[in-house]
Design a protein with these regions (language model features):
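Buried, small/hydrophobic-residue-enriched core segments of structured protein domains
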Residues: 1-169
Length: 171
């Protein structure tokens, strides 16, 4: 939304929502539409929310996992939890820490049969927002800024691998 003109956010959000609905219909899924601004949901009744800002993580001294825990504790369960994981330029580590911390709280609450409170600690996704002038520590430099910097396919792949294998290190 940051680079989208405010005049077209409603139309862009509507097109996105139609694409999600079409995907769900074609592949028998029930994926929800998530947008970051209310304007993007204006034409179809969606509401922005779910992700945290860099400033929120800074308020917790750069501790992404703690910022997500507090976000989860305070907001109602229907607000999707989407972790911004690039604050420290170590997206894989921060993804895994946020995911593990939230899952352990979720599990603790489920063990106490408090499913309503546990639902607040479900991580819906992660958001990469690495500046085009920075290289995440998980991306080995190739010497070409177009391949090394910002959000790039190698960073996305590294984070996906980190998500898929995170549980292997949990107790």
């Amino acid at each position: 939304a940051r680079f989208d003109l405010h005049e077209v956010q409603a139309a862009d959000g509507y097109a996105y929502n139609l694409a999600i609905e079409r995907f769900n219909m074609d592949f028998s899924h029930q994926i929800g539409s998530f947008v970051s601004t209310d304007a993007q949901g204006d034409w179809w009744g969606g509401a922005g929310g779910g992700t945290v800002a860099h400033a929120a993580i800074a308020s917790f001294l750069g501790d992404t996992a703690e910022a997500m825990m507090q976000f989860s504790r305070v907001l109602p369960a229907h607000v999707p939890r989407i972790a911004l994981v690039d604050f420290n330029n170590d997206s894989v580590r921060d993804t895994r820490r946020a995911m593990e911390t939230m899952f352990m709280k979720y599990r603790e609450l489920c063990d106490l049969n408090d499913e309503a409170e546990a639902a607040k600690y479900i991580l819906y996704g992660v958001r990469l927002d690495t500046s085009g002038s920075l290289r995440d520590v998980s991306v080995e430099p190739l010497g070409d800024p177009a391949l090394d910097l910002g959000v790039n396919p190698r960073l996305v792949f590294n984070v996906r691998q980190g998500l898929d294998s995170a549980w292997e290190s949990w107790n």
